[in-house]
Amino acid sequence: NKILFPLSQIKDSSKELINKIFVLSKMLSKTNYKLVIKPHPNFSIKKILRTNSNLLSSNISISNQSVDELLDKCYFSVFMATGAAYNAILKGSIAFTLESELNLADNYLDIFQDKNKYLESHDLVSLKNLLIELKNDKNKLIDYQNEFLKLRTTLINGFNQANNERLEIFGNFKHGN
């Protein structure tokens, strides 16, 4: 039961997510969930980890494997301010957005909320409760799988494909009409 946490190249978002991972690891310590941190290739987390090394616990690991390799191994993924959320959906992961206390617009999946369930942002308590619920309720887990499969299909098929109507609107806009 691995949960992937890909970090953003945005320094503040990555710091915030790392701090939330430390808290969530304690909240999930009595479960068999393993939290996997994937550093962004453009952002070193060594200094943050040195400063907070006492917060690392046995259910947290750090991996430098590619996001795609990790998504193959992690059933769930949790994001804050990174487009890797789309990679996760395309790889079949159930993706959760963690609320930021610094930035209100960090949910990369909110543009799909009108046609898909389960894309709201979570605070740590609601995420912990949901992860435990999904572990214990197979029907709820299947419902989540189906919703994310639907979103995956939307992404694969192109959620904003060109068609005659859109091309006409674009043409009118381009020509100042």
Q: What does each of the following model-derived ranges do?
A:
Residues N1-L4, D72-A81, E133-K138:
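Short, surface-exposed amphipathic charged segments that create phosphate/polyanion-binding patches used
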Residues N1-T51:
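Conserved catalytic-core segment of nucleotide-activated headgroup transferases in glycan assembly
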Residues L7, P39, S66, E99, ...:
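Residues at the C-termini of beta-strands that transition into short coil/loop
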Residues P41-K91:
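Donor nucleotide-activated moiety binding/catalytic core segment of transferases
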Residues N52-N54, G83-I156:
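Catalytic binding pocket for nucleotide-activated donors in carbohydrate/polymer assembly enzymes
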Residues L70-K73, L130, I169:
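CheY-like receiver
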Residues L155-N177:
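C-terminal alpha-helical cap of glycosyltransferases
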